[in-house]
C-alpha cells in the first residue's frame, strides 16, 4: 500500500507539476488555483470551499452540521472575547492596537508590512500589542492566544479573504518563498503540502479524507477534536495556522519550523492569498 501511494504521488507530480514550474504572477497563480478546484469539484459552490472536506463529502458534512448545533468551541470563544476586551495593567486593551478596534479585520491577514519588510500575522500582532502595553507574550499556537485570535476572526465571518501582494519585490519574495514551500517535498515520506491538499485532495489516507487547499485557511484559528482529546479545559481544542503546519510536518516526518517562523509566515501568506474571495468562517470545527 505504501509503495502504491508513493508511486501515485510521483506520477501525480510528474503529470501535474509542469505548469507550476513556469514563471507566473500571483494573480495568474490564483486564477489557475481556483480553476483547478472548481473543475475538479463542479458541484461545489465557490463559497462552500470554506468548509474543507465538508464541502465535498455529504456524509462528513452531515456529521459536521450536527456538531455545529452545539459547537464545542463556544465556551472557548467566549473566553477569547473576554480576554480581548480585558484591559491591560495600563488600562489599554487589544482594540487600541488594531484598525477598526480589531473588529472585522481578519480578512486582511497576513499582510506585507512595507516599513519592516516583514509579513505580519494576526497572532504575531496580538503579541506585539501585549509587549507594547507592558505585558508578557502569550504562547504561540494554542491556548489564550489562539482563543483571542479565534474571537477576532469570528467578527469577520462572512467577509471575504482579501490578502494583498503589493508591487514590492520584497513582498513577491515572501510570496514565492511560500509557494516554493507548498510544492516542495520534505520529510522521510518525501511529500509536499500539495501532494495531500492539491493533487490528492478528496482521497483517503487511512481514515482521513484529504481536504482541498482552496479555502484552507478561511476557518482558522480552528477547533480540532483531536487536540481537544489530548488536552484539558475549554481551550484545549484551539489552534492557529502555524500549529497545524507543524502537525503536517510531523505527519510526513519532517522537521517543523515553529510558530511565527519566516517559513511558516511565507506559507501562510501564499496559501491565504490562494483563497482570496472565500468567506471567513471561524473558528472551524475539524476532526
Positions of PLM-derived features:
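Bacterial N-terminal signal peptides
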Residues: 8-17
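Bacterial Sec-dependent signal peptides at the C-terminal "C-region" and cleavage site
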Residues: 16-24
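Electron-transfer interface patches adjacent to heme c in soluble/periplasmic c-type cytochromes
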Residues: 23-74, 86-147, 154-158, 164, ...
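Bacterial N-terminal signal peptides that target proteins for export
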Residues: 1-9
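An amphipathic alpha-helix/helix-turn recognition signal
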Residues: 75-76, 173
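Solvent-exposed, charged amphipathic helical/linker segments at domain boundaries
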Residues: 159-177
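N-terminal carbohydrate-binding/catalytic regions of secreted carbohydrate-active enzymes
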Residues: 77-79, 83-85
Amino acid at each position: 500500500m505504501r509503495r502504491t501511494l508513493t508511486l501515485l504521488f510521483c506520477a501525480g507530480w510528474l503529470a501535474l507539476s509542469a505548469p507550476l514550474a513556469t514563471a507566473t504572477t500571483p494573480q495568474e497563480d490564483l486564477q489557475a488555483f481556483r480553476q483547478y478546484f472548481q473543475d475538479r469539484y463542479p458541484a461545489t459552490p465557490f463559497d462552500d470551499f470554506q468548509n474543507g472536506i465538508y464541502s465535498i463529502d455529504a456524509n462528513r458534512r452531515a456529521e459536521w452540521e450536527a456538531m455545529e448545533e452545539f459547537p464545542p468551541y463556544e465556551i472557548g470563544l467566549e473566553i477569547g472575547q473576554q480576554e480581548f476586551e480585558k484591559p491591560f495593567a495600563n488600562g489599554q486593551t487589544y482594540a487600541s492596537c488594531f484598525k477598526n478596534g480589531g473588529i472585522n479585520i481578519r480578512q486582511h491577514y497576513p499582510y506585507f508590512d512595507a516599513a519592516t519588510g516583514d509579513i505580519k500575522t494576526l497572532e504575531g500582532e496580538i503579541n506585539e500589542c501585549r509587549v507594547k502595553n507592558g505585558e508578557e507574550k502569550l504562547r504561540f499556537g494554542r491556548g489564550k492566544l489562539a482563543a483571542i485570535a479565534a474571537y477576532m476572526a469570528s467578527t469577520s465571518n462572512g467577509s471575504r479573504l482579501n490578502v494583498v501582494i503589493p508591487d514590492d519585490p520584497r513582498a513577491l519574495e515572501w510570496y514565492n518563498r511560500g509557494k516554493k514551500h507548498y510544492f516542495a517535498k520534505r520529510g522521510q515520506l518525501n511529500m509536499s503540502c500539495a501532494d495531500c491538499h492539491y493533487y490528492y485532495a478528496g482521497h483517503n489516507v487511512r481514515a482521513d479524507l484529504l481536504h482541498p487547499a482552496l479555502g484552507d485557511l478561511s476557518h482558522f484559528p480552528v477547533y480540532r477534536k483531536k487536540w481537544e482529546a489530548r488536552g484539558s479545559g475549554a481551550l484545549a481544542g484551539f489552534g492557529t495556522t502555524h500549529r497545524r503546519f507543524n502537525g503536517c510536518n510531523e505527519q510526513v516526518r519532517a522537521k517543523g519550523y515553529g510558530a511565527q517562523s519566516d517559513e511558516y509566515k511565507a506559507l501562510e501568506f501564499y496559501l491565504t492569498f490562494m483563497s482570496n474571495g472565500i468567506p471567513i468562517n471561524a473558528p472551524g470545527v475539524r476532526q
